[in-house]
Design a protein with these regions (language model features):
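Divalent metal-binding acidic/histidine catalytic loops
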Residues: 1-147
């Protein structure tokens, strides 16, 4: 049975304005808040970002250093940047603090991105037609009816 507390999460990575990696799935744990859900989702995105960074290095592509994740939840950003545990985060499984470690070590950067500009939204929730068309265009997906 699907629990609404097991939130779907997603990410998309772009290189030279083209989507090169994307994912959407239900989180493996039940998050107790939207902050926690976003934090957990960005941990998975961090793993993918670091892997893509290593692939780009291997291919000798010029990439922005360090990789940047755009997050629409300021509390999740603060949680990842603050290495001090507090009551709201002490129950989060240790494996999900990987993002915090990578931020602390300078391997990844986190930037706030308003929800209106989140490209992965189309993967995780129903969107209206105008929003869908915006996301499709930003992801570089062509409208087959206009070919």
């Amino acid at each position: 049975m699907y629990s609404s507390s097991m939130m779907p999460s997603g990410y998309v990575f772009k290189f030279n304005d083209a989507a090169i990696s994307w994912c959407t799935k239900k989180q493996p744990v039940t998050a107790l808040s939207s902050c926690e859900a976003e934090y957990i989702a960005r941990t998975f995105a961090t793993c993918q970002a670091l892997w893509l960074d290593s692939v780009m290095k291997e291919l000798k592509c010029e990439v922005i250093k360090p990789p940047t994740l755009k997050i629409d939840n300021k509390s999740a950003i603060n949680l990842a940047k603050n290495p001090i545990s507090h009551g709201r985060s002490k129950h989060i499984e240790t494996r999900f603090h990987f993002i915090r470690e990578q931020v602390t070590n300078g391997m990844i950067e986190l930037h706030y991105c308003p929800i209106e500009l989140q490209l992965a939204d189309g993967f995780t929730k129903a969107v209206k037609l105008d929003r869908f068309e915006f996301l499709r265009k930003e992801l570089g997906v062509l409208d087959v009816m206009q070919l």
